């Protein structure tokens, strides 16, 4: 007796690709609606010198949530200039005071380093995604209606290599109103979460009742 043949339909169903999970579909939709903004971080870029006498630098980029900022480091091709004439930068994220004074010690932290001006594969590129939430412990979260600041470390010869700085404004979304810019670092004395703040406030009437009894 011939062996029974297995139905082909279940086998064909196993070969069909599975649909992506919901979070993957949301990520793809956000990527499709995002824009990319390029910044060429070198002293020859005239946008770094626009309005330099007003607030310490007029280079401003406006982005929306889920947009990308691409930083392109200085790059040199053959014939290479002398090593001392190549631009090297350490980029920091700072608060408003650090941006105005071009001082990375004003509550700033190192973000990227442009240290390969003669890289054979082209200029170094660093990308910042302006997202509300990040799954990475070392990632940074951004808020609509806020300003964020980037500067490069001031070199010893400030005449030959002026300070470069950038202001990024995150546009408010339809669900948010404009909020005044705040420092990129929050105080350790503030509540770490809305739930914790509500819990603390809810205990105040109980404490007053116990003290008055």
UniProtKB/Swiss-Prot annotation:
Membrane topology reported for the UniProt record: Lipid-anchor; GPI-anchor
Return the GO cellular component terms, semicolon-separated. neuromuscular junction; perikaryon; plasma membrane; side of membrane
Question: One GO molecular-function annotation for this sequence?
Answer: ephrin receptor binding
Propeptide residue ranges? 189-213
Q: Where is the lipid attached (GPI-anchor amidated asparagine)?
A: 188
Signal peptide positions (record): 1-24
| Key words, A-Z | Cell membrane, Disulfide bond, Glycoprotein, GPI-anchor, Lipoprotein, Membrane, Signal
- State the compartments where it is located: Cell membrane
Q: Name one GO biological process term.
A: axon guidance
Listed PROSITE patterns:
EPHRIN_RBD_1, EPHRIN_RBD_2
The task this protein performs is described as: Cell surface GPI-bound ligand for Eph receptors, a family of receptor tyrosine kinases which are crucial for migration, repulsion and adhesion during neuronal, vascular and epithelial development. Binds promiscuously Eph receptors residing on adjacent cells, leading to contact-dependent bidirectional signaling into neighboring cells. The signaling pathway downstream of the receptor is referred to as forward signaling while the signaling pathway downstream of the ephrin ligand is referred to as reverse signaling.
Its subunit composition reads: Binds to the receptor tyrosine kinases EPHA3, EPHA4 and EPHA5. Interacts with EPHA8; activates EPHA8.
Please report the name of this protein according to its UniProt entry: Ephrin-A2
Which organism was this protein described from? Homo sapiens
User: Which gene underlies this protein?
Assistant: EFNA2
């Amino acid at each position: 007796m011939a062996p029974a043949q297995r139905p082909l339909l279940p086998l064909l169903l196993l070969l069909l690709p599975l649909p992506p999970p919901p979070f993957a579909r949301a990520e793809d939709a956000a990527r499709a609606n995002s824009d990319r903004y390029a910044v060429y971080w070198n002293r020859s870029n005239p946008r770094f010198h626009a309005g330099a006498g007003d607030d310490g630098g007029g280079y401003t980029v406006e982005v929306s949530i889920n947009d990308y900022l691409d930083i392109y480091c200085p790059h040199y091709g053959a014939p290479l200039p002398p090593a001392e004439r190549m631009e090297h930068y350490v980029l920091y994220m700072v608060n408003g005071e650090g941006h105005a004074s071009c001082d990375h010690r004003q509550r700033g932290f190192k973000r990227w380093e442009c240290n390969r001006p003669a890289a054979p594969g082209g200029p170094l590129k660093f990308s910042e995604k302006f997202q509300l939430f990040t799954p990475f412990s070392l990632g940074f979260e951004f808020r609509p209606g806020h300003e964020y600041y980037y500067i490069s470390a001031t070199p010893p010869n400030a005449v030959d290599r002026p300070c470069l700085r950038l202001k990024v404004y995150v546009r408010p979304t339809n669900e948010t109103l404009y909020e005044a810019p705040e420092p990129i670092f929050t105080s350790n004395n503030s509540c770490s979460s809305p739930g914790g703040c509500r819990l603390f406030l809810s205990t105040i009437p109980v404490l007053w009742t116990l003290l008055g009894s």
